[in-house]
């Protein structure tokens, strides 16, 4: 497995930034998908919909994976570092709906990584969670919103004196987090758990892998408000701004309906 991971992620262990959804790909294309890329993502979306259907059965039956009940989100502490403080300031610039989503993404993503037994860079994951959707509230025609999120993250990293390689690893994870079908081998833990944590909150995906007590604690700390409605509006605005992008495809495939049907009250 280690050899396979190195071959796909590169000798440095970092994901290939030129892969679909990566930092350099997003900069080069502004997020516009080719016909072949759309076909690949459609297949990944179909797999995700099937997994969601099976997962909802697990959720209804209360079937948790081994170790899920042993994870306690109350023990998760924000890192104390200059980068974390920069990310917190950047997070506070966002609309209230995105601020709450950002912190819930952090908690849900960490819980999933703990259940999966996956090591995360806790500082980078915290900061990525807080800033991953920074650009979504101000969609730019023809330019994927993850670029603005990545740029804000790179500014945080520069202000905190973070090395370029480490900063670009985080920016890459933010760019790829909206790509259906991410994998640990190709996309690395940061990008995967940014997506998976965000999707627990956004559409209830993998909620069946999080203990109910942890879900309740996350919502107690960061209430959802009217998040379903607000998220659907943001997704539709991004899809209108970049119709050939990933959110354009996701909206056409019915993800707003999945958001409305998520197992949350709002």
Residues covered by each model-derived region:
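Buried hydrophobic packing segments
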Residues: 106-109, 149, 153, 157
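His-Asp-centered metal-binding catalytic motifs of divalent-metal-dependent phosphohydrolases/nucleases
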Residues: 121-140, 145, 149, 153, ...
């Amino acid at each position: 497995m280690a050899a396979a991971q190195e071959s796909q992620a590169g000798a440095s262990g970092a994901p290939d930034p030129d892969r679909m959804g990566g930092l350099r790909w997003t900069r080069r294309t502004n997020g516009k998908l080719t016909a072949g890329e759309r076909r690949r993502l459609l297949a990944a979306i179909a797999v995700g919909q099937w997994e969601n259907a099976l997962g909802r059965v697990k959720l209804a039956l209360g079937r948790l994976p081994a170790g899920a009940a042993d994870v306690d989100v109350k023990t998760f502490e924000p890192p104390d570092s200059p980068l974390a403080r920069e990310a917190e300031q950047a997070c506070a610039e966002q609309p209230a709906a995105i601020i709450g989503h950002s912190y819930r993404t952090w908690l849900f993503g960490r819980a999933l990584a703990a259940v999966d037994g996956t090591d995360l860079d806790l500082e980078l994951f915290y900061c990525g969670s807080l800033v991953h959707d920074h650009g979504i509230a101000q969609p730019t025609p023809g330019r994927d919103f993850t670029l603005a999120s990545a740029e804000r993250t790179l500014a945080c990293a520069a202000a905190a004196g973070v090395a370029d390689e480490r900063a670009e690893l985080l920016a890459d994870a933010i760019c790829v987090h909206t790509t259906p079908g991410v994998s640990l081998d190709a996309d690395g833990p940061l990008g995967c758990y940014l997506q998976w944590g965000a999707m627990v909150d956004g559409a209830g995906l993998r909620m069946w892998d999080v203990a109910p007590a942890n879900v309740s604690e996350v919502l107690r700390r960061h209430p959802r408000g009217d998040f379903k409605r607000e998220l659907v509006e943001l997704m539709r605005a991004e899809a209108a701004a970049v119709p050939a992008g990933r959110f354009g495809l996701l909206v056409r495939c019915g993800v707003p309906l999945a958001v409305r049907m998520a197992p949350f009250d709002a």
